[in-house]
Amino acid sequence: MSEKNENVYDLSFFMPGKTIEAEEIKVPISKRFVDKKGNVIPFILKPITTERIDELEKENTTFKNVKGRGRVKDLDSQRFYARIAIESTIYPDFRSKDLREAYKTADPVEVAKRVLSVGGEYANWLNKAIEINGFEDDLEDLEEEAKN
């Protein structure tokens, strides 16, 4: 490889400590949660690691024996995405003891469903969590950013 090409393919950008830390983002999820001044209280979300996503996938996967096909992997995708959203949500912390006790359930996913009980609130929250974890990134948008 020529010296010129080595500069183009500089691997130092990918070395530990060189990446930009994933940032917390504030996202309005529902108009129903307001502070004393009437301002919408945003949720705070932060992407989780690929390793944690892999763990969540394993935790939400079962295997079934299907005649003629053998052992088939079955991912509970609704639960998987809900768990990603739970793990990505910094505030409100649906895993907190206070919220779990207040909503009388040990399951943080159920807490989220009860808190976000109106129409599209729960779906909106799931979509935002999936989006910040890169599942909704449009490949064309990423290619355009890479060009700039």
Curated annotation (Swiss-Prot):
Pfam families: Phage_TAC_5 (PF08890). InterPro entries: XkdN-like, XkdN-like_sf. To B.subtilis YqbN. This is Phage-like element PBSX protein XkdN. The lineage of its organism: Bacteria, Bacillati, Bacillota, Bacilli, Bacillales.
